Swiss-Prot record:
GO-annotated molecular function: 3-methyl-2-oxobutanoate dehydrogenase (ferredoxin) activity
Membrane-spanning segments: none
Gene Ontology biological process terms from the UniProt entry: organic acid metabolic process; response to oxidative stress; sulfur compound biosynthetic process
Name of the molecule in the record: Ketoisovalerate oxidoreductase subunit VorA
Organism: Pyrococcus abyssi (strain GE5 / Orsay)
Catalytic activity: 3-methyl-2-oxobutanoate + 2 oxidized [2Fe-2S]-[ferredoxin] + CoA = 2-methylpropanoyl-CoA + 2 reduced [2Fe-2S]-[ferredoxin] + CO2 + H(+)
Family annotation (InterPro entries): PFOR_II, Pyruvate:ferred/Flavod_OxRd, Pyrv_Fd/Flavodoxin_OxRdtase_N, THDP-binding, Transketo_C/PFOR_II
EC annotation from Swiss-Prot or TrEMBL: 1.2.7.7
NCBIfam families, sorted: PRK08366.1
Record gene name: vorA
Length: 395
């Protein structure tokens, strides 16, 4: 690890994101305010007003326009950032496809917020996961430190494989809650994240090109294949960047799934984001009570870490998949992805889906303990009473 003195700041998740944008030397920000994302953009605007950041800020009239502006700026070779939540992310949908298809390494923070109606400003992963097929990579932060680190790593990964990346944090649980974050001195960030070397630039007037023009059936197929390959290639890049980050700064992200106690666990809890902090605390207590249980925190949902999941599945009898989201007419989204990843690979642990915390409903250590007791019964009996459990349902 590089010897350095971290800059300790007590900041919210949103401010952690803004500081990462500052330290990444982002050149262009285009955004439209929406609760609970707003303070990210306000803090960036403060940096600009105080002369701390040399960022071109583009005020726009909607989230669709924000992403359109980001696309234009990124296509000229700039390092570009935006942020949004929920309905704003949904309004961006068309442009998300465009950014990925044009191979533009834009980084966006999505502050997870439940989709309306009914209106809700609280935590729910459905907004980001409903964009899983747009071609964006997705990193889920457990805490404010991971928000800061995640933005820095997302830029390096995205600019290496030329695919946009989304860093996802929980509404209010992280976005407006203050924690100590160890920030990195600017000169060390510069060494880790050098200036962007664009795949192409519309500002290169000596070598004019067209981007996004019509592709006939003779060519379109290969464009999709190349984007698909970029996602697969991103897995190695993610691990390499995560390992380098750990070697430089002491926080290792070389695994796409952070895991513990897999070797002796009968079953593991699998989930993403801030709820996994609760799970970790509960697992420590449960193990002291004699439960053979572990956890698997999915850091990167896209590209999906199927190889790492298979290693876990081969070691345990069961997986309790915790989804703070739901795909209507189906089941929890992480549950679907996990089952699909294992289907042709031999490992078939018993899997049960628990729908938890929708719309920001509290998910506590006591809830994890209750789910552990249910999973213990499932493992002992060898069969499911039901595949999907709406755990928090009022009865």
């Amino acid at each position: 690890m590089v010897e350095y003195k971290p800059i300790k700041k007590v900041v919210s998740g949103n401010y952690a994101a803004a500081y990462a944008v500052l330290h990444a030397r982002v050149q262009v920000v285009a955004a439209y305010p929406i609760t609970p994302q707003t303070s990210i953009i306000e803090k960036i605007a403060e940096f600009i007003a105080n002369g701390e950041a040399d960022i071109q800020y583009i005020p726009v009239e909607s989230e669709h326009s924000a992403m359109a502006a980001c696309i234009g700026a990124s296509a000229t070779g700039a390092r570009v950032f935006t942020a949004t939540s929920a309905q704003g992310l949904a309004l961006m949908h068309e442009m998300l496809h465009w950014a990925a298809g044009a191979r533009l390494p834009i980084v966006m923070v999505d502050v997870n917020r439940a989709m309306a109606p009914p209106w809700s400003v609280w935590d729910d992963q459905t907004d980001s996961l409903s964009q899983r097929d747009t071609g964006w990579m997705q990193f889920y932060a457990e805490n404010n430190q991971e928000v800061y680190d995640g933005v820095l790593m997302a830029f390096k990964v995205a600019e290496t494989v030329n695919v946009p990346a989304m860093v996802v944090e929980s509404a209010f649980i992280l976005s407006h809650t203050y924690e100590i974050v160890n920030m990195i001195p600017q000169e060390l960030v510069d060494e880790f994240l050098p200036p962007r070397k664009p795949l192409y630039s519309l500002a290169d007037f000596e070598n004019p090109i067209a981007v996004g023009a019509l592709a006939t059936p003779a060519d379109y197929y290969e464009f999709r294949y190349k984007l698909a390959r970029a996602h697969e290639e991103a897995k190695k890049v993610i691990k390499d960047v995560g390992r380098e980050f750990g070697e430089r700064f002491g926080r290792d992200y070389s695994e796409m799934i952070e895991k513990a106690y897999i070797d002796d666990a009968d079953f593991v809890f699998m989930g993403m984001g801030s709820l996994m902090g609760t799970v970790k605390e509960a697992v420590e207590l449960l193990r002291k009570q004699g439960y053979k249980v572990g956890y698997a925190k999915v850091r990167w949902f896209r590209p999906f870490p199927r190889e790492e999941l298979l290693e876990i599945a081969e070691s345990v009898k069961g997986i309790a998949v915790l989804d703070r989201n739901f795909s209507f007419g189906q089941e929890g989204i992480l549950f679907t992805e996990a089952k699909g990843a294992l289907y042709n690979n031999g490992a078939r642990p018993i899997m049960k889906n628990y729908i938890v915390g929708l719309g920001g409903r509290d998910f506590t250590v006591s809830d994890v303990k209750a789910i552990a007791e249910d999973m213990k019964k499932v493992i002992e009996s060898g069969k499911l009473d039901r595949e999907v459990e709406w755990y928090h349902l009022k009865r």
